UniProtKB/Swiss-Prot annotation:
Single GO MF annotation: structural constituent of ribosome
Alphabetical keyword list: Ribonucleoprotein, Ribosomal protein, RNA-binding, rRNA-binding
Residue ranges constituting the S5 DRBM domain according to the UniProt record: 55-118
Region: Disordered, residue numbers: 1-53
Record bears the keyword rRNA-binding: yes
Protein name: Small ribosomal subunit protein uS5
Subunit structure: Part of the 30S ribosomal subunit. Contacts proteins S4 and S8.
UniProt function note: With S4 and S12 plays an important role in translational accuracy. Located at the back of the 30S subunit body where it stabilizes the conformation of the head with respect to the body.
InterPro entries registered for this protein in UniProt: Ribosomal_Su5_D2-typ_SF (IPR020568), Ribosomal_uS5 (IPR000851), Ribosomal_uS5_bac-type (IPR005712), Ribosomal_uS5_C (IPR005324), Ribosomal_uS5_N (IPR013810), Ribosomal_uS5_N_CS (IPR018192), Ribsml_uS5_D2-typ_fold_subgr (IPR014721)
Keyword Glycoprotein: no
Positions with biased composition (Basic and acidic residues): 25-53
Phylogenetic classification of the source organism: Bacteria, Bacillati, Actinomycetota, Actinomycetes, Bifidobacteriales
Gene source species: Bifidobacterium adolescentis (strain ATCC 15703 / DSM 20083 / NCTC 11814 / E194a)
Pfam families associated with the record: Ribosomal_S5, Ribosomal_S5_C
């Protein structure tokens, strides 16, 4: 074997060794990345599951609907569902299916699509408000701490899911659950923060809101901040585990 052939053989062996080493390194990196993505995915799934577990849901009513065809009648169910986090976010949904569990599940999904934030001050509404829907009318008034939710079943379900613990309510007109719930949602959507009212009227915050309301609001903000910090600390501890 000549010297040139020997040099060529050595060069080929060196290239093959380098290629094998590079492929092994890439395999290790890909496996490491997959493990990392798996751990991150598991943490993300745990956070989503914990968020789902924190949600409150109330089935207000389930109606049986009958439809007549040539060959007879078919029955289905319609569920009115309220979903909220108990911390100021709530939504109402309506689901239909031939089975009750499926109707409730559809109602929950519909409610989550229509969630909104409710202004609160220390567990109560910010000001008196009236909501309307069809022939139903619902009145909401602020209440002192410890009063509780003075409301009927349909209005109570919305208040509990929205995180309102003290409120005075009155339902007038239609007693149909759908109308009452939608009137309650209309009232909650009309609520405003004191800053919004002051800006709209061109007045200062002290002129619009009484001192007791401002003190309660400051205390509520401090309590909410403390609860949020505790929740973040617990979440960080779980992720570390």
């Amino acid at each position: 074997m000549s010297d040139n052939e020997k040099e060529t053989q050595v060069a080929e062996e060196t290239q093959n060794t380098q290629a094998a080493a590079e492929s092994n390194n890439e395999d290790r990196k890909s496996r490491r990345g997959q493990r990392g993505e798996g751990r991150r995915g598991e943490r993300r799934n745990r956070r989503e599951e914990s968020h789902e577990n924190e949600m409150l849901d109330r089935v207000v009513t389930i109606n049986r609907v009958s439809k007549t065809h040539k060959g007879g009648r078919t029955f289905s169910f319609a569920a009115l569902v309220v979903v909220g986090d108990g911390k100021g976010t709530v939504g109402v949904g309506y689901g239909k299916s031939r089975e009750v569990p499926a109707a409730i599940a559809k109602g929950q999904l519909d409610a989550k699509k229509h969630m909104f934030t409710v202004p609160r001050i220390k567990g109560t509404v910010t000001h008196p408000v009236i909501g309307h829907d069809a022939a139903g009318t619902v009145l909401l008034r602020p209440a002192a701490p410890g009063t509780g939710v003075i409301a009927g079943g349909a209005v109570r379900a919305v208040m509990e899911c929205a995180g309102i613990t003290d409120v005075l309510t009155k339902s007038m007109g239609s007693a149909t659950a759908v109308n009452v719930v939608r009137a309650t949602v209309d009232a909650l959507k009309k609520l405003e923060e004191p800053e919004e009212i002051a800006a709209r009227r061109g007045m200062s915050l002290e002129e619009v809101a009484p001192d007791a309301l401002l003190r309660a609001r400051a205390e509520g903000i401090a309590e909410a901040r403390k609860a949020r910090e505790e929740a973040q600390a617990k979440a960080a501890q779980k992720d570390g585990e």
